[in-house]
Swiss-Prot record:
Originating gene: TPC1
Keyword terms of this UniProt record: Membrane, Mitochondrion, Mitochondrion inner membrane, Repeat, Transmembrane, Transmembrane helix, Transport
Protein name: Mitochondrial thiamine pyrophosphate carrier 1
Parts of the chain that traverse the membrane: 17-38, 91-107, 127-147, 182-199, 213-231, 286-303
Top-rank taxon, per record: Eukaryota
Cystines in this chain: none
GO cellular component: mitochondrial inner membrane
Amino acid sequence: MSEGVAQLKHEGSRQQVVVAGAAAGLVSRFVIAPLDVIKIRLQLQIHSLSEPTSYRGLNGPVYKGTLGTLKQILRDEGVTGLWKGNIPAELLYLTYGSVQFSAYTNISQMLDTIPAPYTLPSSANSFISGAGAGAAATTVTYPLDLLRTRFAAQGKDRVYTSIVASLKSIAQHEGPTGFFRGLGAGVSQIVPYMGLFFASYESLKPVMADSPLPLPLGSSDAVAGVVASVVSKTAVYPLDTTRKRLQVQGPNRARYVHRNIPTYSGVLMTLQHIWKHEGRRGMYRGLTVSLLKAAPASAVTMWTYERAMGIMVAFEKDGME
């Protein structure tokens, strides 16, 4: 670890971690909202573009790549279509950021108390802390994640007219478990993803800080976040697709922008079905836009978190002097 480059667990008080995490989540979500909608639309598209018969007569859009999807959403739904589901998504990112960074700090500090000779290496500590933080934040915020997906999947036919209406509809027709469809896939995806992300970030952060190339305004945090995100996102992407497919199950499955989404039941069955009928492309559909989204999102998240934390710590020091 480069001297003078603090690990996340050593930065700020618990209250400052919560505030910095919330700020990071809010700013990040606003920046990447359009890419998130495009990614979800591509992930829910089951037909193969190389086989025209698979979507002939389909009552719905056929998206072709990131730019093609962007143009079609703008043409069919206008600019606001790129921010569908943004209210539950902002609440999701705000809450997720707070829980994630708080849990990461607490778990990491707890692991530091393990006595020798069982003390964990720094990378293992970061991986376990990131995995635990991701699992906690995903579980706590999952209903908001599900709402975000369903709103983003709406086309011209509005399945839900408002957040309140969506809550009432899901509770009435699907029960409490309806808010947690795909949670198993979500946790299965996020545990290795956030473990790899934080382990990579903590390792890359001092390397970027010592870079011979000048990186202004703390952008070394952003660069470390980008690299960590690309590595971890690619590794677990099929589980992310599985989660999205499961989140739109239920009585309104055929009313979303893609009206031919199959019926899925469980993580393994969904993975098997996608692999059998869509192959590897189906597993990684939307990966390009996902990386285009994840890279800047992680960069903005980590940059905002580090800057917000730095400002609060500086104010606290000034107040004590």
